[in-house]
Design a protein with these regions (language model features):
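Short hydrophobic-acidic sequence motifs that mark active-site Asp/Glu residues
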Residues: 40, 200, 231, 372, ...
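Extracellular glycoside hydrolase catalytic/binding regions
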Residues: 136, 142-280, 286-298
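Structured core elements
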Residues: 42, 58-60, 230-231, 272, ...
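Active-site mouth of glycoside hydrolases
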Residues: 2-212
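A short, sequence-level motif marking secondary-structure junctions
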Residues: 11-16, 365-367, 390-392
Length: 425
C-alpha cells in the first residue's frame, strides 16, 4: 500500500470498466468487489471493444483523432472518478493504459494501431503524470498481445519509460499482460525479465481446463533476477471452455477455484479471478462477445467470485512472506486432473487436493515436535479440526469427501505456535 503495508493481490478482471459503465454502475460494481474481499481491479483506459471510437457512458471518446498525444479531458474525468472511488474502498486499480490491439491489432483485434515509440512515451508520460498522486495505481502494460517483433518491444519500453519519467522509478509498480505462451517463456519474462521497469512477471494461462499452471509458475518463480509472479488471466468463470462451449461446456466455480489454488500454492504472490460476463460488462443492450450468459450486474454474485476470499483469508491467516512452494512435502502429486499442490512456511504447511484424493505429507519439514491439522473447505471457508499428532516423515491424510468438485485444503501447523483457526484474521 501507499503506507508500505503489504497486501494480498486478490484481483478481478473488469477490462471494460472505464469504457462501458457509468458512475453509478461503476460504484455498485466496486462496492460488490470490496465486500467480496477483492483488492485489485484490472481495467483498461483505451479499451478493447472499439474503445477509441465507441464512446463511454457519457458520449466521450478518449483521444482526438486517435492521437495518443491528444487525450480528451472529459473521458479521463470519468476514469479519475472510478480510480478515486476504488481508493475510497481500499481497492487498487491494475491500470492498462491501452489494450494491446492499439500496438498490434492481430487478426481478431479492433485496433487501430496508433502507437509508435515516440507517442507511446508521450502518452505514458501524460497518463503517468495524471495519476502520479493516486496511491492505488498498479501499471499493467500489454493487454492480451505478445510483441510480434523488436519494434513492438520498443513501443512498450517507451511507454514504460514515459510512465516512470512522471511517476518515478521507485513509485511506478509495473508489469505486462501477455497472451498465453510456453512454460519456458515465463509469461512477460520472455521479453522484459531483464528490464528494470518490470517489477513482477504476469502470465495469461488462458481459458482451457487442464493447463499445467504449476510448471509455468515454477519456471518464472526460479528466474534470475528474482521477480514475483502472478497469473493475470486464468480460466474465467462462465466462459466457454477452450472457446468451445458446444463440446466442452462452460467453466464453473470449481474451474476458477482450481486455477487460483494451484497458482498460489505453486508460487504466485496473489491471483486474478475473471468472469466472462464481467470483463466485457455485458448487458442486454450490448453486443455479446463469445456467448456470455448473464448481465454483469447479476454475474458479480456467481459462486466462484464469492469463494476467492477463502483463498485470501487462508493465506493471510499465516505468516505469508515466508511461504514458499514445496512439492517435496508430498510423495505423489498425481496427474493434471487430480493434482495435489503443496506450499509451506517455517511453521505451517498447506496442501490442496483438487478432487479430494488422499496423500502423504512429510510433516518433518516445519518447526516443532507436535503438529495440529485442519481441513479447510475452499467452497465455503469451513474448518474441520483433525487434532494433534507427533511430526513424522510419512503421514497420510484423507480429505473428508472426494470426487469432481470436492477440493480440500489441508492445513498443518506447528502446535506450539497457537495460530488462529485457518482463515481467521
Amino acid at each position: 500500500t501507499a503506507e508500505g503495508k503489504p497486501f494480498f493481490w486478490m484481483g478481478d478482471t473488469a477490462w471494460e470498466l472505464f469504457h462501458r459503465l457509468n458512475r453509478e454502475e461503476a460504484t455498485s460494481y466496486l462496492k460488490n468487489r470490496a465486500d467480496k474481499g477483492f483488492t485489485v481491479i484490472q481495467a483498461v483506459v483505451l479499451a478493447e471493444l472499439d474503445g477509441l471510437h465507441t464512446p463511454n457512458a457519457y458520449g466521450e471518446v478518449p483521444l482526438e483523432n486517435d492521437d495518443p498525444t491528444k487525450p480528451r479531458e472529459a473521458y479521463f474525468q470519468h476514469v479519475d472518478f472510478i480510480v478515486r472511488k476504488a481508493a475510497e474502498l481500499n481497492i487498487f486499480i491494475g491500470m492498462l493504459p491501452t489494450w494491446g490491439d492499439k500496438v498490434f491489432k492481430a487478426q481478431w483485434g479492433t485496433g487501430p494501431e496508433i502507437f509508435n515509440t515516440e507517442n507511446a512515451r508521450g502518452y505514458g508520460k501524460w497518463i503517468g503524470n495524471r495519476y502520479k498522486n493516486d496511491k492505488n495505481i498498479i501499471w499493467i502494460l500489454g493487454g492480451d498481445r505478445n510483441p510480434r517483433n523488436e519494434t513492438d518491444v520498443a513501443v512498450w519500453r517507451a511507454m514504460a519509460a514515459g510512465i516512470e519519467e512522471s511517476v518515478g522509478r521507485e513509485k511506478a509498480l509495473m508489469t505486462f499482460h501477455p497472451q498465453p505462451n510456453g512454460v519456458q517463456d515465463g509469461g512477460s519474462a520472455k521479453w522484459f525479465h531483464q528490464d528494470d521497469w518490470l517489477d513482477f512477471n504476469m502470465f495469461q494461462t488462458g481459458h482451457c481446463r487442464e493447463i499445467l499452471l504449476w510448471d509455468r509458475m515454477e519456471y518464472a518463480y526460479n528466474l534470475k533476477p528474482v521477480k514475483p509472479v502472478l497469473d493475470g488471466e486464468p480460466i474465467y468463470e462462465d466462459h466457454p471452455v477452450c472457446f468451445n462451449a458446444n463440446e466442452l461446456g462452460t467453466s464453473s466455480a470449481y474451474d476458477v477455484r482450481r486455477a487460483a489454488w494451484f497458482d498460489v500454492f505453486a508460487g504466485a504472490f496473489g491471483h486474478t479471478y475473471g468472469c466472462h460476463d464481467i470483463w466485457q460488462m455485458y448487458a442486454p443492450n450490448r453486443t455479446p462477445v463469445n456467448g456470455p450468459h448473464l448481465p454483469w450486474y447479476l454475474a458479480v454474485d456467481l459462486p466462484g467470485a464469492g469463494q476467492m476470499k477463502f483463498l485470501r483469508n487462508l493465506i493471510e491467516s499465516r505468516p505469508m512472506f515466508e511461504r514458499v512452494p514445496d512439492q517435496t512435502l508430498i510423495t505423489d502429486a498425481l496427474t493434471v486432473s487430480d493434482r495435489i499442490q503443496a506450499t509451506r512456511g517455517n511453521d505451517y504447511i498447506f496442501v490442496y487436493s483438487s478432487v479430494g484424493k488422499k496423500f502423504t505429507v512429510n510433516t518433518g519439514k516445519i518447526s516443532g515436535n507436535e503438529i495440529i491439522s485442519h481441513w479447510y473447505n475452499p467452497r465455503n471457508g469451513e474448518v474441520k479440526e483433525n487434532g494433534k499428532t507427533r511430526k513424522g516423515p510419512q503421514q497420510e491424510f484423507v480429505p473428508p469427501t472426494s470426487g469432481y468438485g470436492h477440493d480440500w485444503v489441508l492445513v498443518i501447523d506447528d502446535a506450539s505456535k497457537n495460530f488462529k483457526r485457518p482463515g481467521q484474521k
